[in-house]
Regions:
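Helix-breaking motifs and short loop linkers at transmembrane-helix boundaries and internal kinks
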Residues: 39, 71, 92-97, 294-295, ...
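Helix-loop-helix hairpin linking two adjacent transmembrane segments in secondary transporters
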Residues: 136-185
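Central cavity-lining transmembrane alpha-helices of secondary-active solute carriers
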Residues: 50-64, 251-263
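Intracellular juxtamembrane helix-capping segments at the cytosolic ends
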Residues: 112-125, 312-326
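Cytoplasmic helix-loop-helix junction between adjacent transmembrane helices
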Residues: 102-139
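Glycine-rich segments within core transmembrane alpha-helices of 12-TM secondary carriers
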Residues: 131-150, 335-348
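Extracytoplasmic gate region of multi-pass secondary transporters
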Residues: 27-28, 205-258
Length: 391
């Protein structure tokens, strides 16, 4: 009982940090509201999510190096402080420049958090239970992702200001910093010295790690793309003009993503990761295919939900396979895998350009996201159940 109590004392503040990690997914809702408020086209508005995920390319590996030197918990706390700062700016200064700064800080904070929080969780959860624990963390993260569009829409309707979401998330960030700071977590020693840039990037020369890296790029590209594009698809197909009437599409995506994470927590603890990964990618493919030619509110939301459900466990399976493949390189692997979230910059950019090229049709965005789906279908044939994980 004492051991269980000690475990829960450590796991709860870590899961609170996963909730704060979910703040990054408000970028889709914020982008669509800012696009409406500032009168931007899709290509210009997609700069905002690109600014969030650009920093994953720049800071992921340095964060892994920093984490090797100061520890995982301290790195997570720094990430939460940067995230809290990003919550302050848009509430007191609101224009295109302030949003670029806000999303940049949110991206930097989330990069620090993504790189350090997963290895911190692995300090208290071991072996084959890691994938299910990472998925549960993603479930908690998805609760924040799911609630953000609803809170923003409610704030827009009640206060005529969707930005009221920021003070709430600021408060949660501060509470998490204090709670985690007071929690003692024993971190395992890995190598005695911090990793270098060359050591981190050299891992990409390993075929298994490269496959996982590209898989995470495609996963997050689909994730961010669906987050931003779902309301636009509803507005285009259903002839809606008010964003408040279509913004719930993002919540539909994250509701199914949340459900998928919750279900995946139990399935991955008991059954084949390979089969579940394949089923997940198949759901994404079916949902994405349906968005090309189907009409009607219910069927479109079903397709969006399929993508959300399928994409909910892709990250956890790929990351856990990579970390278990090289267990003595968890910090470096985590840094490299999180660098793959740079896909959240690449996909929205090309989605915006493709949409513009097709006379502002969201079919352009779907074509770009489908490239990521095709790669994940390929990767599903390579994922293995053994600890060396990928063929």
């Amino acid at each position: 009982m004492t051991n269980n109590k000690g475990f829960y004392t450590k796991i709860v503040p870590i899961m609170m940090a996963f909730f704060c990690m979910g703040f990054v997914d408000m970028v889709g809702t914020a982008t669509n509201y800012a696009q409406k408020d500032l009168g931007l086209d899709d290509a210009t508005a997609n700069i905002f999510p690109s600014m969030v995920f650009f920093w994953f390319l720049i800071f992921s590996v340095p964060t892994g190096i920093l984490m090797s030197r100061i520890g995982r918990k301290k790195t997570v706390i720094i990430s939460l402080l940067v995230t809290a700062l990003s919550m302050i700016i848009p509430f007191i200064w609101y224009d295109k420049t302030s949003l670029i700064i806000t999303f940049s800080l949110l991206g930097i904070g989330n990069t620090l958090m993504q790189v350090s929080l997963n290895p911190l969780l692995s300090s208290i959860v071991k072996g084959d239970k890691l994938a299910s624990s990472l998925t549960f963390g993603q479930f908690v993260k998805a609760i924040a992702s799911f609630s953000a569009p609803l809170i923003a829409t409610r704030a827009s309707l009640m206060f005529d200001d969707w930005r009221m979401i920021y003070p709430l998330f600021l408060l949660i960030s501060v509470i998490t910093v204090l709670w985690l700071g007071m929690t003692r977590i024993d971190e395992q020693k890995e190598d005695g010295k911090g990793a270098t840039f060359s050591e981190c990037f050299k891992l990409l020369g390993n075929g298994v790690i490269l496959l996982c890296f590209l898989g995470i790029m495609c996963h997050v590209g689909i994730d961010v793309g669906t987050n931003v594009t779902s309301p636009r698809i509803l507005m285009e197909r259903l002839g809606l003009t008010n964003l408040d009437d279509a913004n719930y599409a993002t919540s539909v995506y994250f509701a199914f993503r949340t459900a998928g994470c919750f279900i995946g927590t139990f399935i991955l603890a008991r059954y084949s990761a390979k089969k579940f990964f394949g089923l997940s990618v198949l759901c994404i493919a079916l949902g994405m295919g349906g968005l090309y030619f189907l009409h009607g509110e219910i069927i479109l939301c079903t397709c969006i939900g399929l993508i959300g459900f399928g994409n909910s466990n892709v990250f956890s399976v790929i990351l856990s396979r990579a970390m278990l493949y090289m267990p003595n390189k968890k910090n470096e692997i985590s840094g490299l895998m999180i660098m793959g979230l740079f896909g959240g910059t690449i996909f929205p950019f090309f989605m915006g350009q493709a949409t513009k090229a097709l006379d502002n049709s969201q079919t352009g965005a779907l074509i770009v996201m489908s490239i990521g789906v095709i790669y994940l279908l390929f990767l599903a044939t390579k994922i293995k159940d053994k600890m060396n994980s990928v063929e």
